[in-house]
Amino acid sequence: MKFFLMCLIIFPIMGVLGKKNGYPLDRNGKTTECSGVNAIAPHYCNSECTKVYYAESGYCCWGACYCFGLEDDKPIGPMKDITKKYCDVQIIPS
């Protein structure tokens, strides 16, 4: 019984850290665009996602950098479900 009560107290305090995918937002609430030359260079968004937003990887999807493995506390831009499903399939290997 004591073990059960202790678990009820400790687990919520520990929290659950997860990863998410999406278009990360900067301080101004804008996404990193990858149009033109940046869209052609496949490593631009991967570099932005890993070095600026501390994600696992990223690539250009629909004109903005789409990051994989963002921390839960990083804000991401709103998107439609169909866009998320499309961008979640990583086309360009990082």
UniProtKB/Swiss-Prot annotation:
Changing E33F: 743-fold decrease in toxicity and small effect on the binding affinity to cockroach neuronal membranes. Disulfide bonds join C34-C60, C45-C65, C49-C67, C61-C87. The record marks E48 as: May interact with a positively charged residue of the receptor site. Changing K74T: Small effect on toxicity and on the binding affinity to cockroach neuronal membranes. One of its GO terms (cellular component) is extracellular region. Changing D72A: Small effect on toxicity and on the binding affinity to cockroach neuronal membranes. Changing E48R: 608-fold decrease in toxicity and 11455-fold decrease in binding affinity to cockroach neuronal membranes. Residues 1-18 form the signal peptide. Changing E48L: 29-fold decrease in toxicity and 158-fold decrease in binding affinity to cockroach neuronal membranes. Pfam families: Toxin_3 (PF00537). Changing E48D: 8.3-fold decrease in toxicity and 43.6-fold decrease in binding affinity to cockroach neuronal membranes. Expressed by the venom gland. One of its GO terms (molecular function) is toxin activity. Belongs to the long (4 C-C) scorpion toxin superfamily. Sodium channel inhibitor family. Beta subfamily. Excitatory insect toxins induce a spastic paralysis. They bind voltage-independently at site-4 of sodium channels (Nav) and shift the voltage of activation toward more negative potentials thereby affecting sodium channel activation and promoting spontaneous and repetitive firing. This toxin is active only on insects. This is Beta-insect excitatory toxin Bj-xtrIT.
